[in-house]
C-alpha cells in the first residue's frame, strides 16, 4: 500500500491582498486537486523585502508570482520581483511562474519587464477566457514544471482518467487501467490516487494485489488500509461495513492477475457510498470483464519527446552535449523501447556512466541480445500465466510471424492442432500481442524476450525448439564432408538437428553453403520450415552437392522454400499434414511421383517455376483454396478442377502455353488469365455465382447466365443489350480504341466504369445510378449527361470535355481530375466534400469557390486568372516549389489592379490563404527555409514602397503518436522599430486546419503556408511603411485555440518568409521575393550593422558587441565587473538591448542571446576587423620574391612603395587593419590595412606594412589604389568620445578571455606584438574556421607564405601612433 507521498518541496504563491482570497484561493485549491498538497499562500508581495518571506520562497520547489496587471511596474514592484529572482538563484532547481492578473492598459509594460528578465513562463488573464481556464493553464504548467519528475507523460493521461470517471453516473464507479508490462500502469494509478484521495472519506492503495491478499488476508488488509491506527483486528466484513457505511471510499487494486480473487473482493462492496471509486490495474483485460468493469483505459507509450526526456534523465545525459552520434544512439534506444517507460529507464541506467560513445553502442547491442533481468522478469510474469498451447502460439509468433496476416497465421496454427481463434485473443488480452490492420504484431521488447525464452531453454543449438538465427541454422545444416583424392572424407563431426526442433526459418540473404542431404533427418517434429531471402537483390546460393535431399519431416505444416534447387520433393515425404506449399522460383518439374494424401492442403504457390510441367496431383487436394501458378511458362494444361469445391482463387497469368481451361470450379471468385494462350471460355464456365473474372479475352459468350458477374476487363465489343450484364458491378473497357458508342446503362448496378483510352467514343447516353468511379480520360466525349449522386471519383484526364454539369450537389465526390482538358472552358461549382482537385494545363478563365475540405490542388500551368479571394486548404499532399509559387502568384493577381496610391480598404480586399502538407511528401522541394523559429530580413527601399504583405512558410515537428491536432495553430509575431525608435509588433494566429473539419493523423513533420496582407507594418506618409531601416523580424510559435503556447509538445523546426509586393501593370513571380535570413554568406556585416544599429547609442553598440563576441549565457554578476571601469551602465544598457530584442536576461540572471542575433554581432565584428574580399588583389601582386606558379593573378594595382622610419607619425590617412601573415624567410610579419572610409565613401585604398629585413627600424609600405576622398583633417567627435571606452573594453576583454580564446594551442609561447591601434580583444577570433579558410583561399598564397591558416589577429606594429588607428574607427561606420 502506498499512500500519497508527502512532497518535501512545496509551491509558494506570492500575491497581493486583493486576490489572495479570490483568484489565488481557487488556484491553490486546483493545485491540491492535482495532488500538489503542499501549497503555501501566506507570503504577501508586500512582505517580499523581509528575510522570513524570502526564506520561504527559497525553500519552495515552484514559486508562483501573481502580479497585479492594473499597477504600474514601478521601481518598488521591480525591487520586490528582483528579490524573488534572487531567491531562485539561491535555489537552482526552483522554477518561477509569473501570472499577470487583471485587465490592464499597462500589460505591455509588464510583459516587457518580464521578458527583459528572461521569464518564459508568463500567464495572463484575457477577456476571451475565464479565470477557470487561466487556473487550469497555471496548474498544468506547475505540474509539468516540477512535480512530474519520474512521472513523465502522466499529466495528459490523468486528465483522460478524470474525464472517464466524471462521465460515469453517480454510484460506485469503476475504472480499469490496462496495458503491457512496464507501460506505467502503477505510476498512473499512483498519480490518480495522489490527485483524488483527498476528496474521499477513506482511501487505500494496495500494491501487488495478488501477493498482498495472499500474505495478509482480505479483511486484515482492508482494516490496515482503510482504517489505519485501530488496535482491534476486524475479522468480519460486517464490522468494516459498520465503520465505513455510506462513506465515499477510493480503492486502488494494483497489478491484479487473478480475476476470480478480484471478482470476489469487489462483490462485497455494494454497500459503499455513492461517489466511491474503485480502480484496478491489470495487464489482463479478462480481469475487467469478470469484475464487470466496462470503463477500461488503455495506457499508451510515451511520445518521442517524453521518451527522450526520460532517457536523458535516466542516463544522466545532458541535452546540450551536441554530439550527433550520441543523438542517433538515443534515437535507436527510444525507437527500440517504443515508448515503454520501464525499458527506456532501465536501458538509460544501464548506459549511465559509459564515457565513450563506442562503449554505449556496444552495451546497447548486448542489451538487445540479452535484455536486462528487470525487463525480462516483468514480461515473463505474463508469459508464465499462459497455458501450454498459448505459450506455443506466443513463441511461434515471436519467432516467426511478426507482421504476418492474421488469417494466414490462424490457418497454419490450426493445422498444428491449436485453437488460434481463442488463444490469440487471450494473448491480445494479456498485452502480449496486438492485431493492427489485420496483421499480428508484437512489441520489439516482447519479441526479443520471447526469443530469449527459447534461447534460455538450452545452450545446445540443436536442442532448441525454434531456430531463426541464420548462422546457428547454417551450423546445423551445412554439408561437412569434403573430398580428398577423390574420396569423401569427414573432416569433423558436426551436431545435427534433433526431434526437439519444431520451427526453422532461415534467411539466406548473407549465406553461401552446401546443404547436407540428411539435414532434416532427425527433425521428426518439425512443423514449420521456411527458407527464404529477405533481400530481393541478392541471389541465394544454397545447393545440394550430392544432388539429392534424403527426406523431409512428415509433420510439416508449412513448406516454404524459395529457389528450391531440385527437380522434385523426396519421394518418401508424406505431405498429409501440409497446409501450405510455397516454392516460388524453384527448379521443380513436378512435386513428386505417384499419388499423395493432400487432405489438409489449403494453398499452393509455385509461381515462376519455369520448369514445372505437371500439376495433376493437385486434383487430390479437395480442400485447396488458392492455386498460384503465375509465370510457369512450360506448363501446358490446367486440369479440370470442377471437384475442388473450395477453390476460390486461380492465377494462371503468364502461362503462355495454356490454351484452354476445361472446367472452372463453381465457387471461384478470382480467375487471372493475363498472358495466357486462352482466347475463349466455353459457356459452361460462366456460372451464376462467379464473382470476378480478370482476363484479356476477346469474347465471353453466354453473359445472360452470369447473373452475379462483378468484373470484366478489356471487352472489345460491348454487348448489344446491357440487360444481359445482370449484376455486373465493374466494367473496364480501357483502351478499346474502336469502341464508338455505348447503350444507355442507367438501369445497371455498376460501381466502376472505366472508358479511359476509348479514343473513338464521343458520346454516352446515361450513367448507372449507383456508379462510384468514372474514368473518361483520353475519350472524345465533349459533354456528359447528369452525373449520379453516388459518384466518388471522376477522372477525365486529357479528355475533350468542354463543359461539365453542376457538381455542387455531388456530396460523395472526393477526387476530380480535369488536368489536360485543354478545351474545358467553365466549371459551374465544386462539391463541398471534395478532397483532391487537378486542373493543371486547362484553359479555365475563372474558378468557383474552392471547398474548405480540399487537401490536394494542382493548378500548375493552367490559364486561370482568378482564384477565390479567401480560401484555406488543409493537409495538402502535393506541395512543390512550383505549386507554392503558383499560389502566391495566382492568389495575388488582384493586386495588379491596385493603383500606386492604394488604400487600406483596397488592401483588405486582397486574398488570404493557407494550406499545409506533410513534409515527407516534399523532400525534393526547396523552400529555402531557415533553421529555427525566427527569421529576420531587411526590406530594401523598392520593396517598402510596393509592399502588400508577406507569405509565411513554417515547418512544425509533431510527435509521432500525436493524433488529435484539431486545435493546433501557428502564432506569427512580426516585430520592427518605427522611425521614432519605438518597438512595434503585429501578431496573427493562423489555424492549421479548418475548424469543425476532421483532421487526419499528422506526420512527424508538417509544412504550413500562410498569407495575410494585414500581416504587415503600418503605413506612414507616402505609403511608405513606418519601418526604421527596413528591419523586420518574424517569430513563429505553435498554439492551441486558447492561444496557449504548445512548445512543449510541438516544435517549429524551420521557417521562411516571402515578400509580396505590387508592380504597376504587371504581376509576376518577380513580385514574390524570398526573404533572406541573416546568413553570413548572403548578408554582409556592414549591411546588418547599418540596419540593426540605427536606433542604438554608441555605448549600447559597444556593449552588444562585447556580449556577442565573448559571452554565452554568462551571469550578469560575472559580466558587470569586467566592464566596471567603463562608462557603461550595465542595467540600463541591458534593458535597451532587451527592448530591441537583441538579448534577453533569464530568470537566473543569465544574459541570453539568440543564435541569430549572436551571428549578426559576429558579422559586424567580422566585417569591421577583417576584409575578406578586397585583400585578394593586394596580396599576390606584391610577393616579388615568390617563384612564379601557374596561377591566375589579378592585374596589379600598386600605386607606390615607400620606406619610412618606424617612429614616423604616419601618412595622415585613417587606416584599419584587417589581417596579418607570417612570411617565409622573414623575421617579421606583414600587416594588411584598408581605408577606414571604405564603407562610408566607397574607398578601395589598401596598404601592406612590413619591417625591413636589413634595418628593423624601417618600415616598407606598399600602397595599392588611391583614396577617393580628401585626407581627413579632423577626427569625428564620436572617435574622441569612444576611444577611452574602447580601450577599457579591450583591457577587460583581454583579462577575462585571453586565457580561453586568444592563445594558440599549437604555439603557446609565441609572442604577439602589442598594439594600441587594434584592441587586444578583437572578437574576430571567435569566428568559425570556415571564415578563416575563406580568407586564406582568397589570398592566393604562394611559396613564401608560411602556411597557412595562421592569422595573427591581434599583433600590431609599433610605428603607428594611437591617434592614427583608434579603436573608434571600428564603430564609426
From Swiss-Prot:
Keywords: ATP-binding, DNA-binding, Leucine-rich repeat, Nucleotide-binding, Nucleus, Plant defense, Repeat, Transcription, Transcription regulation. It is found in: Nucleus. GO terms for biological process: defense response; signal transduction. Transmembrane segments: none annotated. A motif (Nuclear localization signal) lies at residues 988-1005. Residues 1204-1272 bind DNA. Residues 1300-1323 are annotated as: Disordered. Interacts with PopP2, a R.solanacearum type III effector. Transcription factor. Interacts specifically with the W box (5'-(T)TGAC[CT]-3'), a frequently occurring elicitor-responsive cis-acting element. Also acts as a disease resistance protein involved in resistance to fungal and bacterial pathogens, including R.solanacearum, P.syringae pv. tomato and C.higginsianum. This is Disease resistance protein RRS1. It comes from Arabidopsis thaliana.
Amino acid at each position: 500500500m502506498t499512500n500519497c507521498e508527502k512532497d518535501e518541496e512545496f509551491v509558494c504563491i506570492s500575491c497581493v491582498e486583493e486576490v489572495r482570497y479570490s483568484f489565488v484561493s481557487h488556484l491553490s485549491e486546483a493545485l491540491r486537486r492535482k495532488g500538489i498538497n503542499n501549497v503555501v499562500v501566506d507570503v504577501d508581495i508586500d512582505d517580499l523585502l523581509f528575510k522570513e518571506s524570502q526564506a520561504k520562497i527559497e525553500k519552495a520547489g515552484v514559486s508562483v508570482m501573481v502580479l497585479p496587471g492594473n499597477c504600474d511596474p514601478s521601481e518598488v514592484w521591480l525591487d520586490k520581483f528582483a528579490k524573488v529572482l534572487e531567491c531562485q538563484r539561491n535555489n537552482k532547481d526552483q522554477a518561477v511562474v509569473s501570472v499577470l492578473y487583471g485587465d490592464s492598459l499597462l500589460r505591455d509594460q509588464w510583459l516587457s519587464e518580464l521578458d527583459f528578465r528572461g521569464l518564459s513562463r508568463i500567464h495572463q488573464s484575457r477577456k476571451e477566457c475565464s479565470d477557470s481556464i487561466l487556473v487550469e493553464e497555471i496548474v498544468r504548467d506547475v505540474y509539468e514544471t516540477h512535480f512530474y519528475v519520474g512521472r513523465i507523460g502522466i499529466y495528459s493521461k490523468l486528465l483522460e482518467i478524470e474525464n472517464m470517471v466524471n462521465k460515469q453516473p453517480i454510484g460506485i464507479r469503476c475504472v480499469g487501467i490496462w496495458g503491457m508490462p512496464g507501460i506505467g500502469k502503477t505510476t498512473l494509478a499512483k498519480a490518480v490516487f495522489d490527485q483524488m484521495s483527498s476528496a474521499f472519506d477513506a482511501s487505500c492503495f494496495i500494491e501487488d494485489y495478488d501477493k498482498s491478499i495472499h500474505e495478509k488476508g482480505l479483511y486484515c488488509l482492508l482494516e490496515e488500509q482503510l482504517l489505519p491506527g485501530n488496535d482491534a483486528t476486524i475479522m468480519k466484513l460486517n464490522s468494516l461495513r459498520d465503520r465505513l457505511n455510506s462513506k465515499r471510499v477510493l480503492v486502488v487494486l494494483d497489478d491484479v492477475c487473478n480475476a476470480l480473487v478480484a471478482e470476489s473482493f469487489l462483490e462485497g462492496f455494494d454497500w459503499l457510498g455513492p461517489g466511491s471509486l474503485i480502480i484496478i490495474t491489470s495487464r489482463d483485460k479478462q480481469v475487467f470483464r469478470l469484475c464487470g468493469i466496462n470503463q477500461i483505459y488503455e495506457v499508451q507509450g510515451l511520445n518521442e519527446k517524453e521518451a527522450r526526456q526520460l532517457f536523458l534523465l535516466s542516463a544522466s545525459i545532458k541535452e546540450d552535449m551536441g554530439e550527433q552520434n550520441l543523438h542517433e544512439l538515443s534515437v535507436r534506444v527510444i525507437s527500440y523501447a517504443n515508448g515503454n517507460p520501464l525499458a527506456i529507464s532501465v536501458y538509460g541506467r544501464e548506459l549511465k556512466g559509459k564515457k565513450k560513445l563506442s562503449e554505449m553502442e556496444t552495451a546497447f547491442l548486448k542489451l538487445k541480445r540479452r535484455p536486462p533481468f528487470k525487463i525480462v522478469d516483468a514480461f515473463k510474469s505474463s508469459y508464465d500465466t499462459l497455458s501450454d498451447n498459448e505459450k506455443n502460439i506466443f513463441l511461434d509468433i515471436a519467432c516467426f510471424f511478426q507482421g504476418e496476416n492474421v488469417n494466414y497465421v490462424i490457418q497454419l496454427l490450426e493445422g498444428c492442432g491449436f485453437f488460434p481463434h481463442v488463444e490469440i485473443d487471450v494473448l491480445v488480452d494479456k498485452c502480449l500481442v496486438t492485431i493492427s490492420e489485420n496483421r499480428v504484431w508484437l512489441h520489439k521488447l516482447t519479441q526479443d524476450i520471447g526469443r530469449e525464452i527459447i534461447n534460455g531453454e538450452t545452450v545446445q543449438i540443436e536442442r532448441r525448439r525454434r531456430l531463426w538465427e541464420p548462422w546457428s541454422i547454417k551450423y546445423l545444416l551445412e554439408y561437412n564432408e569434403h573430398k580428398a583424392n577423390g574420396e569423401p572424407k569427414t573432416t569433423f563431426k558436426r551436431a545435427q538437428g534433433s526431434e526437439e526442433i519444431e520451427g526453422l526459418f532461415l534467411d539466406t540473404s548473407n549465406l553461401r553453403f552446401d546443404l547436407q542431404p540428411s539435414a532434416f533427418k532427425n527433425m521428426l517434429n518439425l512443423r514449420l520450415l521456411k527458407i527464404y531471402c529477405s533481400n530481393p537483390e541478392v541471389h541465394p546460393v544454397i545447393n545440394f552437392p550430392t544432388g539429392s535431399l534424403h527426406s523431409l519431416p512428415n509433420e510439416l505444416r508449412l513448406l516454404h522454400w524459395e529457389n528450391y534447387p531440385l527437380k522434385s520433393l523426396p519421394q518418401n515425404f508424406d505431405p498429409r499434414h501440409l497446409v501450405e506449399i510455397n516454392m516460388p522460383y524453384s527448379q521443380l518439374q513436378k512435386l513428386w511421383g505417384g499419388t499423395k494424401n493432400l487432405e489438409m492442403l489449403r494453398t499452393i504457390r509455385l509461381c515462376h517455376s519455369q520448369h514445372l510441367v505437371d500439376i495433376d496431383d493437385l486434383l487430390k487436394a479437395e480442400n485447396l483454396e488458392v492455386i498460384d501458378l503465375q509465370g510457369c511458362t512450360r506448363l501446358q494444361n490446367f486440369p479440370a478442377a470442377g471437384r475442388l469445391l473450395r477453390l476460390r482463387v486461380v492465377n494462371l497469368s503468364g502461362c503462355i502455353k495454356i490454351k484452354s481451361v476445361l472446367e472452372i470450379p463453381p465457387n471461384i471468385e478470382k480467375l487471372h488469365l493475363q498472358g495466357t494462350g486462352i482466347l475463349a471460355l466455353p459457356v459452361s464456365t460462366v456460372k451464376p455465382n462467379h464473382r470476378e473474372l480478370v482476363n484479356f479475352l476477346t469474347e465471353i459468350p453466354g453473359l445472360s447466365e452470369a447473373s452475379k458477374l462483378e468484373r470484366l476487363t478489356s471487352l472489345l465489343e460491348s454487348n448489344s443489350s446491357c440487360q444481359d450484364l445482370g449484376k455486373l458491378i465493374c466494367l473496364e473497357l480501357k483502351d478499346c480504341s474502336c469502341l464508338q458508342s455505348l447503350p444507355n446503362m442507367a438501369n445497371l448496378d455498376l460501381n466502376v466504369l472505366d472508358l479511359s483510352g476509348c479514343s473513338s467514343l464521343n458520346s454516352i447516353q446515361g450513367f448507372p445510378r449507383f456508379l462510384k468511379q468514372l474514368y473518361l480520360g483520353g475519350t472524345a466525349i465533349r459533354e456528359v449527361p447528369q452525373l449520379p449522386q453516388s459518384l466518388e471519383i471522376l477522372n477525365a484526364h486529357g479528355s475533350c470535355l468542354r463543359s461539365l454539369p453542376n457538381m455542387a450537389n455531388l456530396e460523395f465526390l472526393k477526387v476530380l481530375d480535369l488536368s489536360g482538358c485543354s478545351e474545358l472552358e467553365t466549371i459551374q461549382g465544386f462539391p463541398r466534400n471534395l478532397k483532391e482537385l487537378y486542373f493543371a494545363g486547362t484553359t479555365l478563365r475563372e474558378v468557383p469557390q474552392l471547398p474548405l475540405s480540399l487537401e490536394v490542388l494542382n493548378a500548375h500551368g493552367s490559364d486561370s486568372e482568378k482564384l477565390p479571394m479567401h480560401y484555406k486548404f488543409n493537409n495538402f499532399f502535393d506541395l512543390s516549389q512550383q505549386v507554392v509559387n503558383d499560389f502566391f502568384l495566382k492568389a495575388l493577381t488582384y493586386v495588379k489592379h491596385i493603383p500606386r496610391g492604394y488604400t487600406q480598404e483596397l488592401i483588405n480586399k486582397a486574398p488570404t490563404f493557407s494550406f499545409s502538407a506533410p513534409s515527407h511528401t516534399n523532400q525534393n522541394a526547396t523552400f529555402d527555409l531557415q533553421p529555427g523559429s525566427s527569421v529576420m530580413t531587411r526590406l530594401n527601399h523598392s520593396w517598402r514602397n510596393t509592399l502588400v504583405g508577406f507569405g509565411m512558410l513554417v515547418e512544425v515537428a509533431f510527435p509521432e503518436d500525436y493524433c488529435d491536432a484539431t486545435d493546433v495553430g501557428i502564432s506569427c509575431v512580426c516585430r520592427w522599430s518605427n522611425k521614432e525608435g519605438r518597438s512595434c509588433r503585429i501578431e496573427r494566429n493562423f489555424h492549421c486546419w479548418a475548424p469543425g473539419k476532421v483532421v487526419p493523423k499528422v506526420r512527424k513533420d508538417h509544412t504550413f503556408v500562410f498569407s495575410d496582407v494585414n500581416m504587415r507594418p503600418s503605413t506612414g506618409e507616402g505609403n511608405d511603411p513606418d519601418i526604421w531601416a527596413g528591419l523586420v523580424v518574424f517569430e513563429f510559435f505553435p498554439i492551441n485555440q486558447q492561444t496557449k503556447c504548445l512548445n512543449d509538445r510541438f516544435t517549429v523546426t524551420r521557417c521562411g518568409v516571402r515578400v509580396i509586393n505590387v508592380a504597376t501593370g504587371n504581376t509576376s513571380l518577380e513580385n514574390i521575393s524570398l526573404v533572406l535570413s541573416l546568413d553570413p554568406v548572403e548578408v554582409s556585416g556592414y549591411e546588418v550593422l547599418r540596419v540593426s544599429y540605427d536606433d542604438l547609442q554608441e555605448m549600447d553598440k559597444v556593449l552588444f558587441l562585447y556580449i556577442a563576441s565573448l559571452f554565452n549565457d554568462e551571469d550578469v554578476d560575472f559580466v558587470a565587473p569586467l566592464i566596471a571601469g567603463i562608462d557603461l551602465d550595465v542595467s540600463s544598457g541591458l534593458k535597451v538591448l532587451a527592448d530591441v530584442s537583441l538579448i534577453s536576461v533569464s530568470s537566473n540572471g543569465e544574459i541570453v542571446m539568440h543564435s541569430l542575433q549572436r551571428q549578426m554581432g559576429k558579422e559586424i565584428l567580422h566585417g569591421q576587423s577583417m576584409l575578406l574580399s578586397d585583400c585578394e588583389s593586394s596580396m599576390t601582386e606584391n610577393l616579388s620574391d615568390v617563384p612564379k606558379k601557374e596561377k591566375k593573378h589579378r592585374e596589379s594595382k600598386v600605386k607606390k612603395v615607400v620606406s619610412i622610419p618606424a617612429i614616423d607619425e604616419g601618412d595622415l590617412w585613417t587606416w584599419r587593419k584587417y589581417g596579418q601573415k607570417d612570411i617565409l624567410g622573414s623575421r617579421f610579419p606583414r600587416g594588411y590595412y584598408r581605408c577606414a572610409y571604405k564603407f562610408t565613401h566607397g574607398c578601395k585604398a589598401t596598404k601592406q606594412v612590413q619591417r625591413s629585413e636589413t634595418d628593423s627600424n624601417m618600415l616598407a609600405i606598399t600602397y595599392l589604389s588611391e583614396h577617393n576622398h580628401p585626407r581627413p583633417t579632423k577626427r569625428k567627435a564620436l572617435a574622441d568620445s569612444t576611444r577611452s571606452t574602447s580601450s577599457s573594453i579591450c583591457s577587460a576583454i583581454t583579462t577575462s578571455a585571453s586565457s580561453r580564446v586568444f592563445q594558440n594551442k599549437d604555439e603557446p609561447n609565441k609572442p604577439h606584438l602589442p598594439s594600441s591601434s587594434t584592441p587586444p580583444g578583437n572578437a574576430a577570433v571567435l569566428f568559425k574556421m570556415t571564415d578563416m579558410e575563406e580568407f586564406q583561399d582568397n589570398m592566393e598564397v604562394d611559396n613564401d607564405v608560411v602556411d597557412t591558416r595562421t592569422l595573427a589577429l591581434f599583433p600590431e606594429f609599433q610605428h603607428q601612433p594611437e591617434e592614427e588607428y583608434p579603436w573608434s574607427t571600428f564603430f564609426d561606420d
